[in-house]
């Protein structure tokens, strides 16, 4: 009987852990040191969202970044003249879009 209760509790803990919502870091303006200067908070990703981060750089110098819950997230890097825009998405764990 004790084993059955233990297995039931273990199964429930897995279900509860699985059902926890994905939380993402949210920042409207990350400076070049990765410090949020505007809009520092977290957001709860909806069903069609994941955590996203955008880092804009020029050569090896990071200019600024942004973090959010994103519906249209892509893992892609774009080059435009001398600027690089690096979009990264994640959904494997909460707060995974850390700078």
Curated annotation (Swiss-Prot):
Q: Please report which protein family the annotation says this sequence is part of.
A: Belongs to the PATE family.
Please classify the protein's predominant subcellular localization into one broad category.
secreted
State the signal peptide span.
1-21
This chain belongs to the protein called Prostate and testis expressed protein 14
> Which InterPro entries did the record assign?
LY6_UPA_recep-like
Which of this chain's residues carry glycans?
Answer: 40, 75, 82
Assembly, in brief, is: Monomer.
Annotated keywords: Disulfide bond, Glycoprotein, Secreted, Signal
Which intervals hold domain UPAR/Ly6?
A: 22-99
Name the Pfam families on file: UPAR_LY6
Name the residues that span the membrane.
none
Please provide, in alphabetical order, the Gene Ontology terms of the cellular component aspect for this entry. extracellular region
Q: Where does it live in the cell?
A: Secreted
Give each disulfide bond as a residue pair.
24-51, 27-36, 43-69, 73-89, 90-96
């Amino acid at each position: 009987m004790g084993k059955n209760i233990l297995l039931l509790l273990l199964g429930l803990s897995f279900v509860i852990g699985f059902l926890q919502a994905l939380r993402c870091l949210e920042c409207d303006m990350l400076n070049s040191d990765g410090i949020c200067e505007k809009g520092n908070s977290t957001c709860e990703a909806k069903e069609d969202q994941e955590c996203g981060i955008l880092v804009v750089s020029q050569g090896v110098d990071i200019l600024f970044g942004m973090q959010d819950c994103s519906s249209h997230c892509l893992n892609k890097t774009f080059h435009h003249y001398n600027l690089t825009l690096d979009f990264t998405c994640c959904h494997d764990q909460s707060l995974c879009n850390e700078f």
